[in-house]
């Protein structure tokens, strides 16, 4: 079964071979070895603020000869309570694909259930699959492989952590989540990652950031308070301060380690400016790769290649 016409709601929806197919295409699109003509219309429904995801999806479809419609919920009937089922069925008659950024994974899944076009997860509270595809592309660019590497994620066991668990497992890369005990990833997602990884990679949940960073090839962090968690910010700062990605922690990693952050970054909170702007940071390449990875996703789901 190919990817054309499929949804991308979580990386667990894909086989390892399909993840590799997306990443291979993303690399050839970036290098210019492959060009894709995809004169399709992509709709964006974003209930949360966005810079990289909104712009990279828009640029991706337009650079392939398509067009984008920004369907802000506040200026559509969705914002006035029209059922998702009705909206999804109607938009399927006008558009070729939907990229949706919303809070509840359940809402995204409802869109996918009723839509007759591909629905892409542009971030929910549970998952951020397109971000992790760009992350994996960045890692491969730097190391030429994923096997025998270890990625350590420092911070909240959130949507990014969940998708890193699944994505690393899909490509056979060891993954460690270093987090306070009260902020662990969901057990069902950890179990799914372990199932996918099998004996190809190790999936670990640790609470000691120093031990977790020891010998790692990739150190990765994210903001401590995500959108909608602002009231918890003070408690989160207290809990996550030991997990700050700073030079001392970076020195525990492999000498050739790279630093990733999905952005936006709060300097001197989850990451120091020294590390973010340092020679081992690949954050800006990582952000660029959102464009190439999402071009690959769109091209494959829309049957353009």
Curated annotation (Swiss-Prot):
A GO cellular component entry from the record: cytoplasm
Pathway the protein contributes to: Amino-acid biosynthesis; L-arginine biosynthesis; L-arginine from L-ornithine and carbamoyl phosphate: step 1/3
GO term, biological process aspect, one: L-arginine biosynthetic process
Protein's cellular compartments: Cytoplasm
This protein's record includes keyword Phosphoprotein: no
Enzyme nomenclature, EC number: 2.1.3.3
Keywords: Amino-acid biosynthesis, Arginine biosynthesis, Cytoplasm, Transferase
GO molecular function annotation: amino acid binding; ornithine carbamoyltransferase activity
Binding residues annotated for carbamoyl phosphate, in chain numbering: 50-53, 77, 101, 128-131, 262-263, 290
Known function: Reversibly catalyzes the transfer of the carbamoyl group from carbamoyl phosphate (CP) to the N(epsilon) atom of ornithine (ORN) to produce L-citrulline.
Protein name (Swiss-Prot/TrEMBL): Ornithine carbamoyltransferase
Gene name per UniProt: argF
